[in-house]
């Protein structure tokens, strides 16, 4: 029956066409006329387009399902009702992740962690609940590509939010058409090639009643908004000299940008929260976003580690060190880390809880455990590769051109062969390893995996806060009390240890 349901999800061509909307993207002092054709963005756009084409190809039934309303959508774009739905979403997320080898962290399914439950939990948004429903329907039906920008620029953290009106996103005024906002938000990873960006305060934002209401807004910013500009960091894709030299940078660079709103009119239909301190940050807990984005990210990172396992295994074989005991131990540890992620995401799917709207979401305790482990895992992955491979990834030629030049190629063929690989294949392998770990693209991924979920202290403080609210900390303390109640200064008071 599912094969007969119309598929309104975007194709790759639809997605590319949706980006040609006059958005104001700035790079290297110039406005980018068309991100789909500019050499700084075009391959990243094509990578995402490939995901959308997957929704219509051989993997369609892995990636999509028909929901209760008879609409076909990506399996992670609509709320799950049970563990079976979450397991299906897990397969869909993994399928998309393998198309980018886990190296695109903000693919369209990332923001689905929030958007999937927006309609089911629309009541939370009060007067704006109809906007929540409409946005979810458009998101799920078309498979829109959304990102978010929730961080204020770190200019002077000694000041309260309301004291930074000249920089932070805030409401200037309201009109019959909507709200007029100005200010900056970051870090808008990939927003230059998305359909819209979700803008909100960060969950830990401290906003003072009577002073910060203008900052307590949550809305969607369409990328063609005349009052919105994106200032992009340098493009690794643009700098990539060839696919041979930079096989990851050249196609998976999710350009990070800062959103600059200059008296931008946000239509009322795109507003979810307006001057409401409680709702402006309360939606994080209500929506199950923390439960779900960690689920998506953990699955993606597990796929990324599959690639890293293969890179380490082939790399040590090329070096002829695969039989060394320490090398084998490093590879074994890397495999165990990938299995740890797989086990966590399996538990998150098979043992869910219910969010405020009644949908099945991964258990928060498991999501939090993964959230804390991810930065440590990726740091350890890099350490293992650097230790096991040493300087081998640096022993390469300057570029693919050296393999096309007759005299240079003769020298390469003589001196660059590996234990099991011909020179060209050895160089190809180690350039891939370098791009994954040591290039500017690789270094950016080290920063991303360490910080996309929050700073190291905050994620641990969240763990403590959640354990306190949910009673787990009290349960652990009560266990100590039970243990100490077994005995006193005179001996055993109860249990099997008592004896005459």
From Swiss-Prot:
The gene is pvcC. Coiled coil: none annotated. Its cofactor is FAD. Keywords: FAD, Flavoprotein, Oxidoreductase. This is Pyoverdin chromophore biosynthetic protein PvcC. One of its GO terms (biological process) is pyoverdine biosynthetic process. The keyword Oxidoreductase applies. Pfam families: HpaB, HpaB_N. One of its GO terms (molecular function) is oxidoreductase activity, acting on the CH-CH group of donors. Pathway: Siderophore biosynthesis; pyoverdin biosynthesis. It comes from Pseudomonas aeruginosa (strain ATCC 15692 / DSM 22644 / CIP 104116 / JCM 14847 / LMG 12228 / 1C / PRS 101 / PAO1). InterPro entries: Acyl-CoA_Oxase/DH_mid-dom_sf, AcylCo_DH-like_C, AcylCoA_DH/oxidase_NM_dom_sf, HpaB/PvcC, HpaB/PvcC/4-BUDH, HpaB/PvcC/4-BUDH_C, HpaB/PvcC/4-BUDH_N. Disulfide bonds: none annotated.
């Amino acid at each position: 029956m599912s094969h007969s349901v119309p598929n309104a999800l975007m194709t790759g061509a639809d997605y590319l066409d949706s980006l040609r909307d006059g958005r104001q993207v700035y790079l290297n002092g110039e406005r980018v006329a068309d991100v789909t054709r500019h050499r700084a963005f075009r391959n990243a756009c094509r990578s995402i387009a490939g995901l959308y084409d997957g929704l219509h190809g051989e993997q369609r039934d892995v990636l999509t399902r028909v929901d209760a309303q008879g609409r076909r959508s990506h399996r992670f774009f609509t709320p799950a009702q049970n563990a079976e739905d979450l397991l299906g979403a897990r397969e869909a997320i993994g399928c998309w992740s393998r198309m980018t080898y886990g190296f695109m962290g903000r693919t369209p399914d990332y923001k689905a962690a929030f958007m999937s439950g927006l309609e089911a939990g629309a009541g939370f948004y009060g007067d704006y609940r109809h906007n929540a429903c409409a946005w979810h329907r458009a998101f799920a039906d078309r498979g829109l590509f959304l990102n978010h920008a929730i961080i204020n620029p770190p200019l002077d953290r000694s000041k309260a939010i309301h004291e930074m009106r000249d920089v932070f996103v805030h409401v200037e005024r309201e009109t019959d058409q909507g709200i007029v906002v100005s200010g900056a938000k970051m870090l808008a990873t990939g927003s230059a090639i998305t359909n819209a960006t979700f803008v909100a305060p960060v969950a830990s934002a401290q906003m003072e009643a009577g002073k910060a209401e203008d900052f307590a807004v949550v809305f969607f910013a369409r990328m063609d908004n005349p009052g919105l500009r994106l200032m992009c960091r340098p493009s690794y894709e643009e700098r990539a000299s060839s696919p041979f030299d930079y096989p990851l940078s050249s196609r998976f660079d999710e350009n990070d940008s800062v959103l600059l709103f200059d008296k931008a009119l946000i239509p009322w239909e795109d507003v979810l929260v307006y001057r409401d301190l409680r709702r402006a940050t309360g939606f994080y807990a209500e929506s199950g976003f923390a439960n779900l984005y960690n689920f998506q990210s953990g699955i993606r990172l597990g796929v990324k580690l599959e690639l890293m396992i293969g890179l380490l295994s082939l790399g040590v074989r090329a070096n002829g060190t695969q039989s060394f005991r320490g090398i084998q131990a490093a590879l074994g540890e890397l495999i165990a880390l990938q299995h740890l992620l797989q086990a966590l995401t399996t538990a998150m799917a098979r043992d869910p809880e219910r969010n405020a709207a009644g949908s099945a979401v991964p258990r928060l305790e498991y999501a939090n455990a993964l959230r804390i482990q991810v930065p440590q895992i990726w740091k350890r992955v890099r350490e293992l590769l650097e230790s096991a491979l040493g300087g081998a990834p640096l022993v390469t030629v300057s570029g693919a051109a050296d393999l096309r030049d007759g005299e240079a190629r003769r020298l390469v063929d003589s001196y660059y062969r590996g234990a099991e690989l011909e020179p060209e294949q050895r160089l190809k392998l180690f350039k891939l390893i370098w791009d994954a770990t040591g290039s500017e693209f690789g270094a950016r991924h080290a920063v991303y995996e360490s910080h996309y979920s929050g700073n190291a202290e905050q994620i641990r403080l969240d763990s403590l806060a959640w354990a306190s609210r949910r009673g787990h900390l009290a349960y652990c303390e009560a266990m100590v009390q039970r243990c100490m109640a077994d005995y006193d200064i005179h001996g055993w008071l109860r249990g099997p240890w008592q004896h005459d």
